Amino acid sequence: MLVMNLQLFAHKKGVGSSKNGRDSEAKRLGVKCSDGQFVLAGNILVRQRGTKIHPGLNVGRGGDDTLFAKIDGVVKYERLGRDKKKASVYPVEVEEVVAE
């Protein structure tokens, strides 16, 4: 008696999957208002992770370390020593123009 051992193989090759190929969405961090720029109260000055730039005069810090203006005025970025920076907002005097 003749016994045959018949093996069938897949006719399509199995395709492996990669563990790469995805990326996180950008967080849009950075300076939003430049030095000398006029800002309104509530405007965001800097979006950051951690206190890379510290809040100065008339500047608040949000829960995610975002710096924002507390008053209307002009933004000024200043150095604190060698390695620290701070952002301040100084009030500007508005001159009223009277039409004659």
Swiss-Prot record:
Highest classification ranks of the organism: Bacteria, Bacillati, Bacillota, Clostridia, Eubacteriales
Annotated keywords: Ribonucleoprotein, Ribosomal protein
Residue ranges of the propeptide: 1-9
Gene3D superfamilies, alphabetized: 2.40.50.100
Keyword Chloroplast found: no
Family named by the database record: Belongs to the bacterial ribosomal protein bL27 family.
Entry PTM: The N-terminus is cleaved by ribosomal processing cysteine protease Prp.
Annotated GO MF terms: structural constituent of ribosome
UniProt GO cellular component terms: cytosolic large ribosomal subunit
Keyword Ribosomal protein among record annotations: yes
Biological processes annotated in GO: translation
One Pfam family in the UniProt entry: Ribosomal_L27
InterPro entries referenced in this protein's UniProt entry, alphabetically: Ribosomal_bL27, Ribosomal_bL27_CS
Protein name in UniProt: Large ribosomal subunit protein bL27
